């Protein structure tokens, strides 16, 4: 349980750093049509229905006024969020693919990445943090985000 608390603290720090950098500096206008200035990519928690989840919705609601006139949208990470925790890697893979797409299509868009509960584990995989608990071989683990995308 102690390690899980540190994961939550780590995710909160990551989000706070992202918010600080977005609020403190001017975000350049997105270059491509249809690209937001800022996009929240969020992985919902275990057993939450598809979408951003309770924590993701709250974070998006907090981001909008903090960023003033800058356009903000959100991408809900597509993964089962079930009690089959080996599928957490599906969320990491979906987020990784979406990040690569955004970097290619909307290079000036600032990305804020977050997750809650199992979603935080999916996001942690992108940073190369190994999953907690038991694994069978390499199942349940996703490759870290390509440094060129970070």
Model-derived segments and their meaning:
Residues 14-23, 40, 120-125:
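Hydrophobic alpha-helical membrane segments, chiefly transmembrane helices and signal peptide h-regions
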Residues 18-35, 134:
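C-terminal region of N-terminal signal peptides and the immediate post-cleavage residues
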Residues 22-24, 57-59, 132-139:
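Short amphipathic alpha-helical surface micro-motifs
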Residues 2-3, 27, 103:
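Cytoplasmic membrane-interface segments at the C-terminal ends of transmembrane helices
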Residues 1-13:
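Bacterial N-terminal signal peptides that target proteins for export
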Residues 93-114, 118-150:
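Serine-dependent carboxylesterase/thioesterase catalytic core
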Residues 13, 27-28, 143:
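Polar low-complexity intrinsically disordered regions enriched in Ser/Thr and small residues
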Residues 33-110:
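Active-site catalytic motif of lipid deacylating hydrolases and related acyltransferases
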